[in-house]
A protein has these predicted regions:
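Sensory modules in modular signal-transduction proteins
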Residues: 20-39, 139-171
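Structured interaction and signal-relay segments at domain junctions
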Residues: 28-93, 171-192
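PAS-family sensory/regulatory modules and their coupling/dimerization elements
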Residues: 89-108, 112-117, 195-252
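Sensory coupling linkers of modular signal transduction proteins
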Residues: 113-151, 236-273
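Conserved short strand/loop->alpha-helix "switch" segment adjacent to the catalytic nucleotide/phosphoryl-transfer site
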Residues: 254-267, 271, 326, 343-375
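Conserved phosphoacceptor histidine of two-component systems
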Residues: 265-279, 283, 287
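Histidine phosphotransfer helical core of two-component systems
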Residues: 279-308, 321-324
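Short beta-to-alpha transition helix within the HATPase_c
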Residues: 302-306, 313, 325-342
């Protein structure tokens, strides 16, 4: 669905205003994963696009569905209409669900729509203030994020912790996953209201993130846990900055990565030793070739040496690669060098030519390719 074209066709907004709403809509999925709130962007329809009296659709709504980000024409609720009239953030209740609604203003200061956050009915009254802080911070991120920054945002899971703190380092919000993670790390005090520095988190880069307003990611080790810490600063105004701190337990991923590195090192060592053994065999055959006085024996031994060295070459190349894949061109170039050294006399002028694209193949296939090139 072309969201921008739909906005242009059904609302009085111009291209620049449409581009702004379309830009904000790119963060709906990310925003919902952080807030666990339903996020909708709305703007008034053209009068000719409004539904009949029975449906009375008067707003174009941009939201997430199973098909992705879509637009649909809806009847705006009282909170939405009030926002369009006075342009101030509002808290409303629609269908027994709490909504936090914030204005979207274009460069000319005109209110062109709003962002609505619908809070889950399971949220308790004592959590309302924190939920509003969460909505307020998220809507500022949606309004201020650049295209480059949006590309770096990835939805978080239910198991990821989320903390919001301000430029005075006071924690304003912490979701349940964050409380559990920080508790595991040994922080036994109330999270919200305390200083981010009083926690057990390793957050030495906080001031730099707040001052420079740049995204920062690090992996920190806490005893037997590895936590990826992703900080996203948000400019709430000229003199206020808040920061999302996403905590992701990547202990399992880190262990798997370490295991892969160990396995890769072992594989490279095996290839290196196989190469040495093959070269030893080739050396023994070369000694036998020197001792023999029969030309046909020398030729047979030399052919065997070439085959063995072609296989040793593959293992040598793999032992220097981080992956168990080799470029055919690399095999060809090295094999031609060996063949030139062992078979081409100084008075001969032999040219080797490679034509075609280079291809990556597994070390298993590379052994066959090297033998084929050797025979050719």
């Amino acid at each position: 669905m072309d969201i921008g074209q739909d906005i242009l066709n059904t609302t009085p907004l111009g291209p620049l205003q449409t581009s702004l709403l379309e830009h904000i809509s790119k963060l709906i999925s990310f925003g919902e994963s952080l807030t666990r709130q339903r996020i909708q962007i709305f703007t008034p329809l053209l009068e000719k696009s409004q539904g009949d009296r029975h449906q009375r659709a008067d707003m174009l709504c941009i939201e997430r569905s199973d098909q992705g980000i879509i637009t649909r024409q809806v009847k705006g609720n009282n909170t939405w209409h009030t926002l369009m009239e006075n342009g101030q953030p509002l808290i409303g209740v629609e269908h027994d669900q709490r909504q936090h609604v914030f204005p979207v203003v274009d460069n000319g200061g005109r209110i062109i729509g709003g962002i609505a956050f619908t809070v889950s009915p399971s949220i308790k009254i004592e959590q309302y203030e924190q939920e509003y802080t969460l909505s307020d911070t998220m809507q500022r991120l949606m309004l201020t994020a650049t295209d480059e920054q949006i590309q770096s945002y990835e939805p978080i899971s239910y198991f990821d912790g989320l903390i919001i703190f301000d430029d005075s380092h006071r924690i304003l919000y912490g979701n349940e996953a964050a409380v559990q993670l920080v508790d595991l790390l040994g922080f036994d005090r109330r999270l919200v209201g305390s200083s981010i520095y009083s926690s057990t988190l390793k957050v030495s880069a906080i001031q730099q993130v707040l001052d420079d307003r740049t995204i920062y990611t690090s992996e920190e080790i806490y005893q037997d846990m590895v936590i990826r810490q992703h900080m996203i600063p948000i400019a709430m105004g000229r003199n206020e900055t808040r920061c999302f701190l996403v905590l992701h337990d990547c202990t399992r991923e880190s262990k798997q990565q370490q295991e892969l590195l160990v396995k890769n090192s072992i594989i490279k060592e095996v290839h290196h030793r196989v190469k040495n053994n093959l070269q030893t065999v080739a050396g023994l055959l070369r000694m036998e070739a020197r001792r023999s006085s029969l030309p046909e024996v020398k030729q047979a031994l030399q052919e065997g040496i070439n085959r063995i060295e072609s296989m040793a070459l593959v293992h040598d190349i793999v032992s220097h690669y981080d992956e168990d894949y080799i470029g055919i061109r690399s095999i060809y170039d090295e094999l031609c060098r060996l063949l030139r050294m062992s078979m081409v006399r100084q008075d001969q002028d032999v040219t080797f030519t490679y034509s075609g694209e280079d291809m990556l193949i597994s070390s298993h296939m590379a052994s066959y390719v090297s033998l084929i090139i050797n025979e050719l």
